[in-house]
Amino acid sequence: MASPDDPLRSDHMAKEPVEDTDPSTLSFAMSDKYPIQDTGLPKAKECDTVNSNCPPNSDDQPQGEENDFPDSTKDPLSGVSRNQPCKDRKGSCSCPSCSPRAPTISDLLNDQDLLDTIRIKLDPCHPTVKNWRNFASKWGMPYDELCFLEQRPQSPTLEFLFRNSQRTVGQLMELCRLYHRADVEKILRRWVDEEWPHRGHSDSSMHF
């Protein structure tokens, strides 16, 4: 075994390359091959140059002017009058201004002749014929209230109609069909078809 002072061993070690582990020399050598990128923030002048060359952000545009449409918050129908009377004087127009609204029971209360006819039809009590009690019970009137109205001298049918004046005549006609009172439905149908169009038009003309 060769000793540390062996001249052959010393000669062999002199021929082998020695690795340089000095970090300072390594960093200089790597910087020559791979330049270090500057990741710092751009200078003020560079920022001004970049901003001047960049197009404006689309998000900064006024929202009302996107796609070349003018900014407007007005009602598109503001220039159109919704309550303009119809100019057709022939009576054949079917526009909303000329068409009468759906009649309510409160409209029936203005026709005394019609009320008298309905009262005569619905006031009497018959064992097999439905009357005002069935109508009122169907629309939610309690039993005690039914008995109370029946004892009063006034017509219970008229009282029933007064308490349901906001309902439509169409709903009242449905009750007539439900309880097979075709005689009352026929009276109401004739009034809706013949009398109400004139009354409805006169009521509409009062608004103009």
Swiss-Prot record:
One of its GO terms (molecular function) is death receptor binding. One of its GO terms (biological process) is cell differentiation. Residues 49-61 have a biased composition (Polar residues). Gene3D superfamilies: Death Domain, Fas. One of its GO terms (cellular component) is cytoplasm. Residues 1-99 are annotated as: Disordered. Residues 1-18 have a biased composition (Basic and acidic residues). Pfam families: Death. Transmembrane segments: none annotated. Binds EDAR. Self-associates and binds TRAF1, TRAF2 and TRAF3. PANTHER family: ECTODYSPLASIN-A RECEPTOR-ASSOCIATED ADAPTER PROTEIN. This is Ectodysplasin-A receptor-associated adapter protein. It comes from Mus musculus.
